[in-house]
Amino acid sequence: MNARDYFDWVRDASRDAESIRQQLMALESRAKALGGGGFEPRTRSTPDPRRMEGRIVAYMQREGELKTRQEADYAIIGRACRLLYGEDEDGRGGVSAGCGTLHADVLWWRYLDDSPWKQVASVLGSSVTTCRAAHDAALRWIDESGTLFDAAEMYASYIKSR
């Protein structure tokens, strides 16, 4: 797996994590509307407790499935952050130390935040051309440094979990 493929995968995980976050919020709202969420006292009775129980069980199963996927996505995102900024994510390692902070930040905004080039450039106070050059140089550095040696295994495990 090369760096570009890896970061495309990271972008997919980032998008999925955001989608799951929104789905969990919607599920929570529905559960509260059904009377199954939160610890607030119920102010209305449910017409058929057996029907409600089935809905609550289905909600809990779906929530569990989504949270498992979200945890896998967060593991991928965390691994990418350590690759970009070092094990402590303090900028003293990874791409940040090997190429420069701009290079790491470009990859973060482009893939983990899923930002378009104009937004990446604006946030970083650089031109799109400079950001694209930093992007390409960072991907090249990652490929040449061999820092993705375990990414293929992680990807295979991720695919199996879907």
Model-based region annotation:
Residues 15, 115, 130-133:
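Short, well-structured alpha-helical interface segments that form or flank functional binding sites
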Residues 97-115:
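Short amphipathic alpha helix immediately N-terminal
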Residues 127:
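Helix-turn-helix DNA-binding motif, specifically the short coil turn and the N-cap/start of the second
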Residues 131-145, 149:
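DNA major-groove recognition helices of helix-turn-helix
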